[in-house]
Amino acid sequence: MSGYSGTPLPKKLGVKEGARVAWLNAPDHFDALLGELPPGVAVSRRLGTGLDVLVQFATSRAELRRRLPKLRDAIFPDGAAWVSWPKRASGVPTDITEDTIREDALPLGLVDVKVAAVDETWSGLKLVVRKELRG
């Protein structure tokens, strides 16, 4: 299934053939939203290391703030950590916004490079390690 743009969600998220990915705290319907993944993609539901792409779903800023350093450590230097939060219009209680994610991510050396709709409920902000901090 594709999002509003018609682009398949795996492509929006940057999931490529052979990628190591993790979906953290994903809603039950996330697999259906993703549809078919590229060949050889290894999916985990737990935080590991050496990930190409991870998607962390969150509704609490305090919890996300605690998780962000672990998310940064989990991705390859050129990988991406997506943070997905409920859209204001979704009616899902949250204290997270695009701005609060930036406020908490920037001091950790994470910068945002893209925003995308995941579905009617969730937005996503793509975070990457600042270029000068990549080893």
Map each language-model feature to its residues.
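Short, intrinsically disordered, mixed-charge
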Residues: P39, P69-P77, E103-P107
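N-terminal, charge-rich interaction modules
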Residues: M1-A32
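Conserved Class I S-adenosyl-L-methionine
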Residues: D95-A116
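Mid-chain, well-packed structural core segment of small domains
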Residues: L64-I96
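Short acidic low-complexity segments
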Residues: G40-L51
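Short, glycine-rich nucleotide/cofactor-binding loops
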Residues: L54-L64
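Class I S-adenosyl-L-methionine
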Residues: G109-G135
